[in-house]
């Protein structure tokens, strides 16, 4: 009986260490849906969407996609999705000068409304 308890404790410790190691390498998917202040189809709208794609040049950004909403199920017109190899990579992106400048100079001024959500992705 004591042997079984000991083996159970050892397996629990190994599992916890494995889980903790995985949490340090968990991928992150950052998603935002948004509505612009610009008229649909305008040059300003197109310029904003081009500017978003430049965020892909920031170190750590993977799989950046900017998508157009096709249904009337909500008030948002566009979606943005990108992935990061880790929480650390995502944190570095958030504080990167190019991202901060984009948010201050474009996002705050040109986005009417948005919803942001971040997911852990299974490894």
Label each PLM-derived region with a short phrase.
Residues 8-9, 35, 105:
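A periodicity- and composition-biased signal for non-globular, repetitive helical segments
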Residues 1-2:
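N-terminal secretory signal peptides that target proteins for export/translocation
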Residues 90-95, 100-107:
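C-terminal structural segments of small proteins and small subunits
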Residues 12-13, 52, 97, 106:
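Alpha-helix boundary/capping residues
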Residues 61, 103-118:
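Conserved short beta-strand edge segments in small beta-sheet-based binding/regulatory domains
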Residues 5-14:
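Sec-dependent N-terminal signal peptides
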Residues 13-78, 85-92, 118-123:
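Short S/T/G/P-rich N-terminal loop/turn motif that feeds into the first structured element of a domain
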